[in-house]
Amino acid sequence: MSNVSGILETAGVPLVSANWPQPSPPPAVPAGPQMDHMGNSSQGAPWLFLTSALARGVSGIFVWTALVLTCHQIYLHLRSYTVPQEQRYIIRLLLIVPIYAFDSWLSLLLLGDHQYYVYFDSVRDCYEAFVIYSFLSLCFQYLGGEGAIMAEIRGKPIKSSCLYGTCCLRGMTYSIGFLRFCKQATLQFCLVKPVMAVTTIILQAFGKYHDGDFNVRSGYLYVTLIYNASVSLALYALFLFYFTTRELLRPFQPVLKFLTIKAVIFLSFWQGLLLAILERCGVIPEVETSGGNKLGAGTLAAGYQNFIICVEMLFASVALRYAFPCQVYAEKKENSPAPPAPMQSISSGIRETVSPQDIVQDAIHNFSPAYQHYTQQATHEAPRPGTHPSGGSGGSRKSRSLEKRMLIPSEDL
């Protein structure tokens, strides 16, 4: 066979006809990243959990379950809105779950290089300040107001404790200035946090704010320092007030309430701090998504924070359900001689809960130069610490929405 091939080649006869079809070349392989049948990049951009449907689906399940549980509890309180001086603060505390959960979920859905999450997180952080103030105000209402509290603690020596941060107050006694400090420390956070939120949004618009950027030319460093100092002062005041009045608050079972609120705030605070440290140490690196967008390390840290909060809010909703039950208020409604119409009661309760009138009045009172001569007390007879105020249906809209206050000399307390 080889001899025949040689003879044909010598004679100039081609072995393959020119008219025969030539074999097609192999298909060209694109130089970019290869995509498998699942749509994930086989090389180049890694698979990112935070932007996956799995992360959004899991977080969504936790968020919507928490929303259903908490909204049902809020509805029960509005149906039995018999002690508005207490329940308006309870409802405000319960709202931390819908606001934290839904806000974090939206931030996770919009995670990307545009950093839309900064705007949502600002709303969440502002409500954090509102929660600290509302919890302190609820404790004041439990004990009958400033006048009733001072009647119990005034003149008593302050116990020195390193755990509660009173070791430097040895030899001092409680006075009206103590209550003023507790209120001012929480109210300042209600002022500082919105200012920092607006500042963050402005710096973000001008490209001067990036999460995790501790450069002295970046606004993140200064916003973080001011925020941490402000929230630490507010939490210290809340802790100090609980240390002082824990025996008076015992009938109201404050431990679960206190631990639940502190856990929600502290966990978000320390989680954010830990993630910032991990990002700073390079544990959380900058990544590139399959769409070609680059996500900074600070953006990823904020994304992990939002995902964790989505999961935690379900457990917070369950804990708050036990911490702030509505049975005691429902019993007062049953014993009421003339309960109001359900829809009227719910609508008026919502209006009173969302109204910031009491916060403005409290801020004016506690930062007034005349505070050292006066203290605040409700015109209705304040109950003794450890007892709920006497019932009534709360049906009178006027008596609930207009809580009259009078000033009496602190010397009379």
From Swiss-Prot:
Family: Belongs to the TMEM184 family.
Keyword tags: Cell membrane, Cytoplasm, Cytoplasmic vesicle, Endosome, Membrane, Transmembrane, Transmembrane helix
Subcellular location(s) of the protein: Cell membrane; Cytoplasm, Perinuclear region; Cytoplasmic vesicle membrane; Early endosome membrane
MF GO annotations: heparin binding; transmembrane transporter activity
Membrane topology designation: Multi-pass membrane protein
Highest taxon above the source species: Eukaryota
Metal-binding keyword on record: no
A Pfam family of this chain: Solute_trans_a
Role of this protein: Acts as a heparin receptor in vascular cells. May be involved in vesicle transport in exocrine cells and Sertoli cells.
PANTHER family linked to this entry: ORGANIC SOLUTE TRANSPORTER-RELATED (PTHR23423)
Tissue expression summary: Expressed in vascular cells (at protein level).
Name assigned to this protein: Transmembrane protein 184A
Cystine pairs: none
Main location: membrane
Region (Disordered): 372-413
InterPro entries: Ostalpha/TMEM184C (IPR005178)
GO cellular component labels: cytoplasmic vesicle membrane; early endosome membrane; endosome; perinuclear region of cytoplasm; plasma membrane; secretory granule membrane; transport vesicle membrane
TM spans (from-to): 47-69, 93-113, 130-150, 187-207, 223-243, 258-278, 300-320
